[in-house]
């Protein structure tokens, strides 16, 4: 009996449409490489039905499977563009620490809670 998830079945169209679009792009990359569903599924170590679900944009497929598929298709770098950090966070990462702040990753004696 297939698993069901109330939260996955109630996805808003604003969420479902990008997943479907992503699935179609994955399929296009697979077809461009002239791989059959069976060949790609074997490379992904999943069933052909699971690959079809991924290519259909089904929300229940694993994000790990998606990452593996992107890697196989030479598209793993595109995953870096998903949910980029807000500009404020990126700017804070570029700020250098002063000597008074201490080295990154070092907890001052007074800040330790153990």
Sequence positions of predicted segments:
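N-terminal flexible/basic segments that precede or flank functional cores
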Residues: 1-18, 79-82, 86-114
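Short basic helix-loop element that most often maps to the first helix and adjoining turn
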Residues: 24-39, 100-104
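Short alpha-helical DNA-recognition segment
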Residues: 34-52
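Short acidic/histidine-centered micro-motifs embedded in hydrophobic/aromatic stretches
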Residues: 43, 69, 82-86
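Short, basic-rich loop-to-helix N-cap that marks the start of a DNA-contacting helix
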Residues: 57-71
């Amino acid at each position: 009996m297939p698993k069901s998830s109330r939260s996955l079945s109630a996805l808003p169209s604003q969420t479902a449409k990008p997943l479907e679009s992503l699935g179609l792009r994955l399929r296009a990359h697979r077809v461009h490489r002239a791989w059959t569903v069976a060949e790609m599924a074997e490379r992904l170590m999943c069933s052909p039905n699971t690959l079809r679900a991924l290519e259909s944009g089904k929300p229940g497929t694993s994000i790990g499977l998606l990452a593996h598929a992107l890697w196989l298709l030479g598209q793993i770098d595109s995953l870096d563009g998903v949910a980029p950090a807000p500009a404020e966070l990126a700017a804070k990462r570029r700020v250098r620490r002063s000597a008074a702040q201490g080295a990154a990753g070092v907890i001052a004696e007074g800040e330790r809670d153990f």
